[in-house]
Structure formats: C-alpha cells, structure tokens
Amino acid sequence: NSHSVRSSPTLRGKALRELFLCQKVPDPPPNVDFSALEEAGDVPTARERLQVHNSNPSCAGCHLITDPMGLSLEKFDGAGRFRETENGVELDISGELDGIFYDDVHGLTAAMRDHPKLSACLVNRLYAYGTGGPVELRYDRDALARFTTRFAEQGHKLPELLRDLALSEAFTRVRPPEAPEESVVNAAKPPQSQVASTAR
C-alpha cells in the first residue's frame, strides 16, 4: 500500500480501515487536483505534504479518517525498510483513530484492538474466506452474529474463532442454487412462432 517510489499514508490508512474495520473509504472525486500534493517542492515529510488535504473540503472528509492512521506507519518507507527520518527530518508517527489519540505504532495497535468494529470485521473476513465468500447478509447475518458473540465470549482468541468456523454448518453444507427468475427462463426460450416455423 505505497506508491512506486515513496510511502503513502493515505493508502495505508485506507487499507487498515477497509481490511480490519470493514469501513469502505470512498474513491477520490473524479476532478480532484493532485498537482498541489505532487508539487510540494522541498517539504521534507509526508505529514507536511499531506496538510494540503485539510485545505480542500472535498478531500478533507476522507483524508481525516485515513491519513492519521497511515502516518503512524511512516517509519517504514515505500519498500518497507525501517527508518527514523525522512529527508533528514525526524519522523512524527503520532496519530488518531476515531477520537483515540496515540504516540506511535504501538498506540495504533492498541486503538485498533479496542475498536468496536474490529471483532465483527475479523469474523466477517474469516467467514468469507473460509466459505469461499462473499458474505450474503440475507443468509449469513444470524451466523455472523453468533460467531461474533462467541468470539467476544472467548476473549477474542483467534484459534477458537477458527475452530468454531471450521466446525460450523457453513463448512459442511452447500447452499442450493437459487431458481432462475421467470424473466430469465422466458428469455432463454425461443418464441412459439419461431418454434412453429422451424418445425415446418
């Protein structure tokens, strides 16, 4: 979740939101102007470069929920190498997650761990992976609720969740295919007039 030559706090924060909290982050507007960010000149750190987002109302809404998380991972550059500085400037990796402020990546980890959406999202992700997904709430809602409750009761222990999933009916039964809609069936049949003319 980085660009080809540099890290991307925005992409990293977006990945954390979507993969671990199951919160969809909207794509940027089609007319967004990236030039202000790309032409940041001699601004030394990503934190300073990304300040441009806060001045644009069409960008600020989403970047406020991605950038603070991603900036906490800035001690890993675009290739994943550990670093203490960027362009000679010591990195500030403090951040915020939904009102929880922290000083470093360990604080981010704790904030993610305690987030109210993490548990249900992990259950959803593992259930979808284990059953071949995607999750369909009209069929899977009750099962997901049960697994989420059990996961909490067991102290959020991942091995126990995996065991429950593997022993569930979702792994031992196959959902029958749905009957095709009437319009689809009729569309597959040739008109009676065509059948009659073919038979002559």
Predicted segments with their positions:
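Sequence context surrounding c-type heme c attachment/ligation sites in exported
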Residues: N1-V105, T109-R113, K117-S119, R138, ...
